[in-house]
């Protein structure tokens, strides 16, 4: 397997797909809420990681590849956070803003156990023609420059039949 992994080092990889922000709130549970029979998590740490197709790109970077991401994100705080994370890692991208919020998966962990996951996303996001064309144009521009194409489809709208 090391031979296969070494063979992709230095490759330029186009990642097309649904990017997401994974947010974690970690804390301790010492009591049950008086309002409802649910644990109260006293949050001691919060952090974000790249999720979905963005996580694929991060993993490719870790394998020595040069990922290039084409995707959509919201014109919101979480979208800005993701753009900063891509910049900090040096991952090239073309991320087009949509009117929908950035897909965000928020997990609350209490005493090392996941208590709940909150999904911030629009159900069955459909691309308008303009955004679809921007994605297609970005993919067409990138194809001559890359060695590998990865499609990371989570069913959130980027990878439709046209794209």
Region locations from a protein language model:
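Ribokinase/PfkB-type carbohydrate-kinase core domain
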Residues: 1-30, 45-163
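Flexible glycine/proline-rich, aromatic-decorated loop/lid segments
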Residues: 31-35
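Divalent-cation-assisted or electrostatically stabilized phosphate/pyrophosphate-binding catalytic cores
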Residues: 37, 41-44
């Amino acid at each position: 397997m090391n031979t296969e992994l070494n063979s992709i080092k230095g490759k330029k990889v186009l990642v097309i797909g649904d990017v997401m922000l994974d947010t974690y709130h970690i804390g301790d549970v010492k009591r049950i809420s008086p309002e409802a029979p649910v644990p109260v998590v006293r949050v001691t740490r919060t952090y974000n990681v790249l999720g979905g197709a963005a996580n694929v790109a991060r993993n490719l970077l870790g394998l020595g590849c040069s990922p290039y991401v084409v995707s959509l994100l919201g014109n919101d705080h979480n979208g800005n956070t993701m753009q900063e994370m891509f910049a900090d890692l040096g991952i090239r991208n073309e991320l087009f803003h949509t009117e929908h919020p950035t897909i965000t998966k928020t997990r609350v962990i209490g005493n090392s156990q996941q208590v709940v996951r909150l999904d911030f996303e629009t159900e069955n996001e459909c691309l308008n023609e303009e955004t679809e064309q921007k994605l297609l144009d970005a993919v067409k521009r990138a194809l001559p420059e890359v060695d590998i194409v990865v499609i990371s489809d989570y069913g959130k709208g980027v990878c439709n039949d046209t794209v």
